[in-house]
From Swiss-Prot:
The lineage of its organism: Bacteria, Pseudomonadati, Pseudomonadota, Gammaproteobacteria, Enterobacterales. Transmembrane segments: none annotated. Its EC number is 2.3.1.16. One of its GO terms (cellular component) is cytosol. Heterotetramer of two alpha chains (FadJ) and two beta chains (FadI). This is 3-ketoacyl-CoA thiolase. The gene is fadI. The active site is at C99, H392, C422. It comes from the Bacteria. One of its GO terms (biological process) is fatty acid beta-oxidation. It comes from Salmonella paratyphi A (strain ATCC 9150 / SARB42).
Length: 436
């Protein structure tokens, strides 16, 4: 094992995660229909600051992410600062790392803290799959640019006459990889076939996720970390995730048809995470700054790692690559963890990564490591359910996982937790958290 890389400031301060909060997560075109991501971000950051009672000028930086970006608000972070009553001099910029976006936001704020340029910052992300940047065809876009430069009506009419009827159709955001044309579900199907993951195994994991998430809500474990929201016309509160199917049975999952490989596939809408709207954020500080303000941190960021692999085959293996690196940098092993939380983009992807974490062959032949990262104990794995149940607003999921894991660690008396996610483009992210 290589030497650990402690995440501390020049003064020896640990990176404290003081608090975290999220909106309820809503299935596409339901509770947050018509609410853009920037407004979801304002909701969660405004409420997070109000609950924390931290002076507004104590926050020196806000790093926020959005995967499905809206052209009218390209820097969502700055819009959140300006729309929440934060100090207008607060540094704010946006990041995007697909499904690991808020992991990246947290890492960026942590690096600013370690560099000594700030002492407190906010990291998070928001996405809306209900408010989308619906575009136009390339042919129409080109004509519109040329029409804007045309000088006469005749020139404009000539340009428009070149268009065909199909060129006028709206173009929704792409759901496929730019470089390969593969959809995420196609990759999940690849992984199911490569690693021999059955439909029954996928449905069982999805059912487990929903059951555990429903139980977490029923036991009141999520109430402190999920805010109540009100949206126009402001008559009814929206306070709980609306994707969780607590009353479902395994037989219900078996009824669904494959969503991607229609003839021979096993990936369905039920064993995949749905399109979702929501936002989440966390406040980070140096340990000494938290003490100055009289705050008791939820926990600390012990390490993080980002990795990348090829996109043509089984590209959602990010957790199998990033987990051993994050553990190594934390000076820990799998056995040292109290909790292990993995983003469930698809049940097939989740099960494939779990399989490879325990594989000696994968460790030696692919990672170049002497031994496997380690089997993940089921009693430590996604104990409150995962993204299949809660949903997945792309840029918000990492902050949800971090906050949720730290709260659960504290309920268990402290310890170490690892959160990890795959992401489009063959990317992976993992973070080791510590609670006392």
């Amino acid at each position: 094992m290589r030497q650990a890389l402690p995440l501390v400031t020049r003064q020896g301060d640990r990176i404290a995660i003081v608090s975290g909060l999220r909106t309820p997560f809503a299935r596409q075109a339901t509770a947050f229909h018509g609410i853009p991501a920037v407004d979801l971000g304002k909701m969660v950051v405004g409420e997070l600051l109000a609950r924390s009672e931290i002076p507004a000028d104590a926050i020196e930086q806000l790093v926020f992410g959005q995967v499905v970006q809206m052209p009218e608000a390209p820097n969502i972070a700055r819009e959140i600062v300006l729309g929440t009553g934060m100090n207008v001099h607060t540094d704010a910029y946006s990041v995007s790392r697909a499904c690991a976006t808020s992991f990246q936001a947290v890492a960026n704020v942590a690096e600013s803290l370690m560099a000594g340029t700030i002492r407190a910052g906010i990291a998070g992300g928001a996405d809306s799959s209900s408010v989308l940047p619906i575009g136009v065809s390339k042919a129409l876009a080109r004509v519109l640019v040329d029409v804007n430069k045309a000088r006469t009506t005749r020139q404009r009419l000539t340009l428009f006459s070149r268009l065909r009827l199909r060129d006028l159709l709206p173009v929704p955001p792409a759901v496929a990889e730019y470089s390969t044309g593969l959809r995420m579900g196609d990759t999940a199907e690849q992984m199911a076939k490569t690693y021999g993951i059955t439909r029954e195994q996928q449905d069982a994991l999805a059912h487990r996720s929903h059951q555990r998430a429903a139980q977490a809500w029923a036991e009141g474990k999520l109430a402190e970390e999920v805010m109540t929201t009100y949206v126009p016309p402001y008559k009814n509160p929206f306070a709980e995730d609306n994707n969780i199917r607590g009353a479902s049975t395994l037989a219900d999952y078996a009824k669904l048809r494959p969503a991607f490989d229609r003839k021979h596939g096993s990936v369905t809408a039920a064993n995949s995470t749905p399109l979702t709207d929501g936002a989440a954020a966390v406040i980070l500080m140096t340990e000494s700054r938290a003490k100055e303000l009289g705050l008791h941190p939820l926990g600390y960021l012990r390490s993080y790692a980002f990795t990348a692999i090829d996109v043509w085959q089984d590209m959602l293996l990010g957790p199998a690559w990033s987990t051993p690196l994050a553990l190594e940098r934390a000076g820990l092993t799998m056995a040292d963890l109290t909790l292990f939380d993995m983003h469930e983009a698809f049940a097939a992807q989740t099960l494939a990564n779990l399989q490879l974490l325990g594989s000696e062959r994968f460790a030696r032949e692919v990672l170049g490591r002497a031994q496997a990262t380690g089997e993940v104990d089921d009693a430590k794995f996604n104990v409150l359910g995962g993204s299949i149940a809660y949903g997945h607003p792309f840029a918000a999921t990492g902050a949800r996982m971090i906050t949720q894991t730290l709260h659960e660690l504290r309920r268990r008396g402290g310890g170490f937790g690892l959160v990890t996610a795959c992401a489009a483009g063959g990317l992976g992210a993992a973070m080791v958290l510590e609670a006392e």
